[in-house]
A protein has these predicted regions:
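Conserved class I S-adenosyl-L-methionine
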Residues: 1-55, 60-64, 84, 88, 147-174, ...
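Class I SAM-dependent methyltransferase SAM/SAH-binding core
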Residues: 60-107
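Short alpha-helix
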Residues: 185-202, 208
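A C-terminal cap/extension of S-adenosyl-L-methionine-dependent methyltransferases
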Residues: 207-238
Length: 238
């Protein structure tokens, strides 16, 4: 039986391996550039916005919004992740901008008094047993005229990654989740399906971007040409 992933058991490892790496840095750079465009579209008057960071984990991205004066409701299933996030938020002097909510995203409506201007739902659906209703619930929290930033693990990218690594039998078997890879998502989502879910919820898709389209396929540097992280970021921006 597949269950929603709770990172209480490996929160510190998650923080180090996912965000404390070149891959994490590249992801944050590209995602932030996309968020800046979203903010310009939603916030022409430059007022403070109400933001929901649904399944926001360590709150790296939403802290950038808080620094701009926006108010953030940070929701996560993992209490350990929330505690780590609180420490970092407090260290950065942003605690007054935050409301921390220990809850699965599926129950977030119980914790919000009113809809929000912006929803961030990043890298959560691939860890859920049933992502579609969770996405629908999150989108229901967006007020008219607001916007949502949705990021998910691309099924096609997962197929390609396994093929490049020579895991062809695994692909032919349907890529069942391997429990020993605790930081590997339970599933990838097919973009065409997610786009339909979003549109069926009454939203117009205003932009799309690939995150780490190249860096995930760069192999062992010992056998490759010389390059720097900045070079990979420049490639991702193309």
């Amino acid at each position: 039986m597949t269950e929603d992933r709770n990172f209480d058991d490996i929160a510190h490892k998650f923080a180090k391996n996912i965000y404390g790496s070149d891959k994490g840095e590249i992801r944050q750079v590209i995602v932030w550039e996309e968020l800046e465009q979203l903010l310009c579209a939603v916030n022409g008057s430059r007022k403070s916005l109400d933001v929901l960071d649904a399944g926001g984990g360590l709150a790296q991205m939403s802290q950038k919004l808080a620094k701009l004066g926006h108010r953030v409701a940070l929701c996560d299933l993992s209490l350990e992740m929330l505690q780590l996030a609180k420490q970092d938020i407090e260290k950065n002097g942003l605690l007054e901008q935050y409301r921390l909510i220990h809850s699965p995203v599926q129950n977030i409506a119980e914790h919000l008094e009113q809809p929000v201007d912006v929803v961030m739902f990043h890298a959560v659906m691939e860890w859920l047993a049933d992502p579609k209703p969770a996405l629908e619930t999150v989108l229901e929290q967006v007020k008219p005229g607001g916007a949502a930033s949705i990021m998910f693990y691309n099924h096609h990218g997962l197929v390609y990654k396994n093929v490049v690594c020579g895991n062809i039998p695994h692909v032919l078997e349907g890529m069942p989740h391997r429990k020993r890879f605790k930081l590997q998502p339970q599933k990838g989502l097919k973009p065409e399906e997610v786009y339909k879910w979003i549109e069926d919820a009454g939203f117009e898709i205003c932009g799309k971007a690939g995150i780490r389209c190249f860096s995930d396929y760069i192999g062992n540097r010992e056998y490759m040409g010389d390059y720097k992280t900045e070079d990979v970021v420049a490639l991702e921006r193309q």
